[in-house]
From Swiss-Prot:
Record-given protein name: Nodulation protein H
Function: Required for the formation of sulfated nod factor. Proposed to transfer activated sulfate (PAPS) to a N-acetylglucosamine of the nod factor.
Nucleotide-binding listed as a keyword: no
Entry GO MF terms: sulfotransferase activity
Record-listed E.C. numbers: 2.8.2.-
Main enzyme class: transferase
Pfam families membership: Sulfotransfer_1 (PF00685)
Domain of life: Bacteria
Designated gene of the protein: nodH
Species whose genome carries this gene: Rhizobium tropici
Keywords: Nodulation, Transferase
């Protein structure tokens, strides 16, 4: 169905993989007027009843996201979805179509890129992408090659630059993963103000759990080797953070 005018204001959450987008979306969906419908370009996302939607054109997909979105049991004034960087490779023209969508506001979620890559490799190895209940099982420690680190770091830099170049600064809000986990109430308030949605008290009802609580030095088997290789370069910052007490996952 096409929802009656006035249409909800559109937004999108953009990020590299494993940067806390599920957690941010859970916080937003707790708001009585905000609806975020998961990964538009993920054919397995259960938010979308149309399992054949990826056969549609880019424009039709965006109309599905912002005009024909799944019904919700609340008055929706802001509607959105999220897209991870690798999903744009499968639809080369989709980013430009997204950038042309009138009135779109963009939330760019960022994270220490080394943490993002380590978490991605762990999830691929275990097949566990989300964790909804606490347990004592730790994800496996992993090793990363210099080449895969360099490729991933560059992909993240290029993606962040592309987003910043494509959208007016007034339509773009950047949120850091660590701030989201350590200061969720303040981050949520900033996002709501950016979207123009009414203030809403942080409820802490999100059930998503951190999968990795160890530092990079403990969860990455060749951390010292990689830190030595990248020392003095533009990516040294990913190894210099004191993340021993920072939430991760």
């Amino acid at each position: 169905m096409i929802h009656s005018l006035p249409s909800p204001e559109p937004f999108v959450i953009l990020a590299m993989p494993r940067t806390g987008t599920h957690y941010l979306e859970a916080l937003l969906n707790d708001h009585p007027n905000i609806l975020s419908n998961g990964e538009l370009l993920n054919s397995y996302d259960e938010n979308w009843p149309d399992k054949d939607r990826l056969r549609h054109s880019d424009r039709e997909l965006l109309e599905l996201a912002y005009m024909r979105y799944p019904p919700a049991k609340k008055k929706v004034t802001h509607v959105g979805c999220k897209i991870n960087e690798p999903q744009f490779y499968e639809r080369p023209g989709f980013f430009d179509e997204l950038a042309r969508w009138q009135g779109l506001k963009v939330i760019l979620l960022t994270r220490n890129t080394l943490e993002s890559l380590r978490s991605l490799v762990q999830a691929r190895q275990t097949g566990q992408w989300l964790k909804f209940s606490p347990d004592r099982n730790e994800p496996p420690s992993v090793s990363l090659s210099v080449n895969e680190c360099e490729a991933y770091f560059k992909a993240a830099d290029d993606f962040h630059a592309r987003v910043k170049d494509a959208f007016d600064p007034s339509k773009l809000l950047m949120i850091e993963y660590q701030d989201l986990l350590l200061k969720p109430s303040a981050c949520l308030a900033a996002v709501l103000a950016f979207l123009g949605a009414p203030a809403h008290r942080f409820s802490n009802r999100a059930t998503i759990q951190r999968q990795e609580t160890r530092s990079l030095a403990r969860s990455l088997r060749n951390f010292v080797e990689l830190r030595r290789h990248f020392a003095g370069g533009p990516y040294a910052k990913f190894f210099e953070l004191d993340d021993a007490s920072a939430p991760q996952g």
